[in-house]
């Protein structure tokens, strides 16, 4: 399995409140997915490369972030560095039920300037060499209007060149001026998407839909090759070639932190789909990895806690 995956998005410094104080790390939805993809590939010793595309500063914290990603096996060749910008930061507070509250400092983060400062033709030349392009709703939400148009045009060209486009909407209301703008943007990217890895709660919050069937009906109109609609601890609905199949999870009784549950699911899904071409096996792999991640604190669990898929 010789494949190249490009992951586009934002990574931030992560501060985690623990019983003993504060712990510093890094996280961001797409970076989490990139790390877990790289780990799975390395553990199986397969020829699958994962490159992260974003922007950071030229400060020592940005240096530390890049070194950490490299240690995880993520290619950082195309991470842009801007001397006048810094990475964003977020703080996680965990609740007793395993859910969490986030507090962000990201308005002037370097990643917000990446598309604006880079030439689309240059990015296309680089990215068209990849088999699969992965991005999320947050990748879109942090762009200004002009950059958003540039990014969507870039994805359109990459799709036309034969790249597989994978999208996770990961809707975060606070990042969008209005729900209507998020809807318009998501509809544009879904029209270019091959594999949609979405979350039912996010979709229903954005579209005010009452039932899963309402959401499925809307999404299937995009003609997606694969649609996965995740429902947290219950399982997910997988739709391929118009056929719906529910894939349940195995109950996890020691959940401590749901950070990166969806991101890790996506990584395992993509990895297993690339190796097996079986969407159901891919969803089961997603459940396995996500089920392990939520038993640990933080977005990125310890290497020795990784399951075998």
Regions found by a protein language model. Name each.
Residues 1-72:
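Glycine-rich phosphate/adenosyl-contacting loop at the front of the ribokinase-like
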Residues 3, 208-309:
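Conserved phosphate-binding/catalytic region of the ribokinase-like
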Residues 11, 169, 264:
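Active-site metal-binding loops of divalent metal-dependent hydrolases
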Residues 15, 46-137, 309:
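Conserved N-terminal subdomain of the carbohydrate kinase-like
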Residues 37, 199, 262:
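Short, conserved phosphate/pyrophosphate- and ester-handling motifs at nucleotide-, phospho-/glycolipid
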Residues 125-126, 188-189, 220:
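Structural alpha-helical scaffold elements that stabilize or flank donor/cofactor-binding regions
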Residues 132, 138-217, 235:
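Conserved beta-alpha-beta core of the PfkB/ribokinase-like small-molecule kinase fold
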